Structures are given as structure tokens and as C-alpha cells.
């Protein structure tokens, strides 16, 4: 049996580290099979030497985040554990990030993974950014947050959000309703992100003034967009022609963020994805950068990753070999 002791400089450290009902330390205990004891101004970790060493690294990293003003929760505790398990515990302090903006409910919007932090920093420092990766990695939400931040700081005068109105198994011409009613469901995720950060009333006022626009990609044709923060979502469903059209809308003092998941292409068979092609064609141009997310950047409920892994495992078992 091996013991590790950590002394706290302030009681607030212990309170923040352990969390409500010691939930953060329960996660550490379950992950490493150790025992964590709270002794007020100190704590002890007991167990096998190797497991205690890993748990101690995780705890020390979490204390560093607390000292930088971060609040701990299940999500960042589990992410810190994953970094420790990969031997990347020295990168934990870099998770502490400045707040991008505050939602209407008072919640700070911050990057939650190293991949997200790289994405936000890349958007800050470049004119055109491609964010490519699986669903749940915060590609669109963080891009909208950066757009709202730039708009509030008067760095741009407009926010423009767009996506192609192409989804699996549905054709707009066969859906009931007028054009606005038809395209609204496809744009709903963009509306939701803006409502979250601006509130429905403020969003509506900005939309009426023309300072915020949410529209299908086809509406971008023939325009030059100056002083704008422009986001193209679900870009894997653009054709090469649409992508070229969109990117060449860039005007002076504007920024473009393009997001998509190249594993979820809903284009008809035989159609190339404009996103896949653009990333290849533009990779050597300065001020155009691609950030790639992985499943480690998924920030949804922890069960989502378990569900994805279970389906992948099931799929591998049930793939019939070709004769």
C-alpha cells in the first residue's frame, strides 16, 4: 500500500477540488482503484504505487486549474484523467482559458479540450479557418461564440451564418410550407446557438437591423461580405462549386469559419464534397488553416462516447468479408 499526501494552501482549494458530495474525487477513485481521504487542510491517496502516482498527477493538474480560476466539473475532471493516462499531464495547465463570452443564462463559454483551445486560438489569428471533426466537438458553437465576441467588440458589423439545405432523404421541394418554413429546420442549430448567447429578443432586433443573418448557402451568391464574421456549417454537404462560391464572398475586414464532419456526407452518390476538396486545395495558402478534431474533443455526455464505441464494435463484428 502506497500513500500520497497533498496539503492545501486554502480551504477553497479542497472544496473546489472535491466538488459537491466529493463527486470529483469519486471519479478519481473509480478510474484508478485508489482511496481518497479528505482531511480538511490536506488529502491522502492510498493504493498501488503506480495507480497512486497517476491519481496524484491528475489531482495536481486539477489543483493547477483551480489556481488559474477554473471551476471543476465531471467533464474537465475526466478530460484531465485522459491526459494523464496518455502521459500528457504537462498539458493540463494549458486548459485554463479566457472566457469567450457569457450566455444569457450567465454561463461562460470556454474551450473545454486542447483541440477546442487550438481551434479558438486559430480563429483569433487567421482569416479563414476550417474546423473538421465529429459531432459534439463544439465546432459550430465555439465559432458562433467567437462571432458574438467580435460583434460585441465592434470588430465586425455583421454576423452571417449559413449552411447548405441538404439532408439525408429529404428534398426541399417535397416539404410543405413556404421557403422560410422549409429552410428553418435546417438552420435551427445556428438559431439555437445565437439564442443561447444573445437571447431571442436581442437576436430578433439584430436580425431586423440586418446585423445578424441566418440563411441557406444559396443566398450568398453574388455578394461581397465586408466587415463580417461568416460561418458555414455542415460544409461537408457543399459541392466544390458551392464551396468556391462561398469562400470567394470574403470581403475586407471579414473572417470565415467553415465547419463540417467529412464522415457524415449527405450528398447524392457520385458528388464530391466541397469541404474535403477545399481542405486539400487550400492547405498551403497562408492565413487559411485547418483544425482537425477527434473523438477526444467530444464534449457531450460521457455515455455518448460509450454508445459510439459500442456501435463501432458492433459494426466491426457484423461486417461481412467480401468474397
Residue ranges of predicted features:
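Interdomain "pre-motor" coupling segment immediately N-terminal to P-loop NTPase/helicase cores
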Residues: 37-96
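Short amphipathic alpha-helix segments
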Residues: 13-30
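Conserved loop-to-helix interface motifs that mediate assembly, gating, or partner/ligand docking
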Residues: 86-107, 111-114
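Short glycine-/aliphatic-rich beta-strand segments at the starts of folded cytosolic domains
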Residues: 1-16
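Flexible glycine-/small-residue-rich
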Residues: 8-10, 38-40, 47, 163, ...
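A short, structured beta-strand/loop element
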Residues: 29-37
Amino acid at each position: 500500500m502506497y500513500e500520497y499526501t497533498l496539503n492545501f494552501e486554502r480551504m477553497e482549494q479542497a472544496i473546489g477540488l472535491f466538488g459537491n458530495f466529493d463527486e470529483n474525487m469519486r471519479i478519481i477513485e473509480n478510474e484508478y482503484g485508489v482511496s481518497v481521504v479528505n482531511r480538511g487542510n490536506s488529502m491522502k491517496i492510498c493504493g498501488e504505487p503506480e495507480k497512486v502516482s497517476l491519481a496524484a498527477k491528475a489531482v495536481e493538474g486539477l489543483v493547477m486549474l483551480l489556481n488559474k480560476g477554473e471551476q471543476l466539473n465531471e467533464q474537465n475532471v475526466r478530460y484531465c484523467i485522459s491526459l494523464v493516462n496518455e502521459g500528457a499531464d504537462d498539458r493540463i495547465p494549458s486548459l485554463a482559458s479566457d472566457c469567450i463570452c457569457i450566455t444569457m443564462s450567465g454561463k461562460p463559454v470556454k474551450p473545454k479540450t486542447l483541440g477546442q483551445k487550438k481551434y479558438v486560438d486559430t480563429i483569433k489569428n487567421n482569416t479563414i479557418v476550417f474546423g473538421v471533426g465529429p459531432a459534439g466537438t463544439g465546432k459550430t458553437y465555439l465559432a458562433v461564440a467567437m462571432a458574438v465576441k467580435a460583434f460585441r467588440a465592434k470588430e465586425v458589423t455583421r454576423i452571417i451564418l449559413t449552411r447548405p439545405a441538404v439532408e439525408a432523404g429529404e428534398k426541399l421541394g417535397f416539404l410543405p410550407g413556404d421557403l422560410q418554413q422549409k429552410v428553418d429546420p435546417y438552420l435551427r442549430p445556428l438559431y439555437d446557438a445565437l439564442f443561447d448567447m444573445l437571447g431571442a429578443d436581442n437576436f430578433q432586433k439584430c436580425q431586423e437591423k440586418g446585423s445578424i443573418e441566418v440563411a441557406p448557402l444559396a443566398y450568398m451568391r453574388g455578394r461581397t461580405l465586408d466587415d463580417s464574421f461568416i460561418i458555414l456549417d455542415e460544409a461537408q454537404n457543399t459541392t466544390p462549386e458551392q464551396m468556391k462560391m462561398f469562400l470567394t464572398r470574403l470581403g475586407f475586414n471579414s473572417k470565415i469559419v467553415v465547419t463540417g464532419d467529412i464522415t457524415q456526407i449527405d450528398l447524392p452518390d457520385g458528388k464530391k464534397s466541397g469541404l474535403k476538396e477545399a481542405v486539400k486545395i487550400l492547405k498551403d495558402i497562408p492565413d487559411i488553416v485547418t483544425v482537425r478534431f477527434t473523438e477526444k474533443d467530444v464534449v457531450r455526455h460521457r455515455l455518448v462516447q460509450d454508445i459510439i464505441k459500442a456501435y463501432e464494435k458492433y459494426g466491426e463484428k457484423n461486417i461481412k468479408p467480401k468474397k
